[in-house]
């Protein structure tokens, strides 16, 4: 199973990027997590651009989503919200209408912040957007609060409880992919 991990932060060595790398380390056998690093190549959503030609950064994101079995979002929180660059990427990936690269693609969300609540509002905002885009999403909310205290000096996720939560989330994502694939197969057979 191939999962595209999208880190919502543009900052180098961000907490979110470290958590995304930890998720790849914790992935169940047979699950490959590929890190997406093109968020900064996606222009602000503009329907005029969509009508002319899809920008190269958007085309790359769409192709990588379409080549994946699932998507993993790892997001920080800015002012009680998901980062604009991440929301912008979701907007582009869901367009044009009727051709969403997110529709039907299973997803899981991890939010992480140095604040105690672990960016839970950002995670909930992305979950809400995925409801609209038709993206089946794991119900488990993984919000890693005080993430700065849970990462080791080498960048690995050292906190056992956080590791267990991420591991459980990835197992549930794998189950969701199986369910979606089974439903699609049944629709084709009908």
Per-region residue spans from a language model:
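A general structural signal for well-ordered alpha-helical segments in protein cores
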Residues: 3, 16, 20, 42, ...
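N-terminal beta1-alpha1 ligand-phosphate binding loop
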Residues: 1-31
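Cofactor-binding loop segments of dinucleotide-utilizing enzymes, especially the Rossmann-like FAD-
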Residues: 8, 38, 112
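Helix-loop-strand module that forms the ligand-binding subsite of alpha/beta enzymes
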Residues: 53-133
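N-terminal beta-loop-helix "entrance" segment that forms/cooperates
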Residues: 38-55, 153
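Short beta-strand elements in bilobed, periplasmic/extracellular small-molecule ligand-binding domains
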Residues: 31-44, 136-145
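Glycine-rich phosphate/pyrophosphate-binding loop and the adjoining helix
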Residues: 4, 136-190
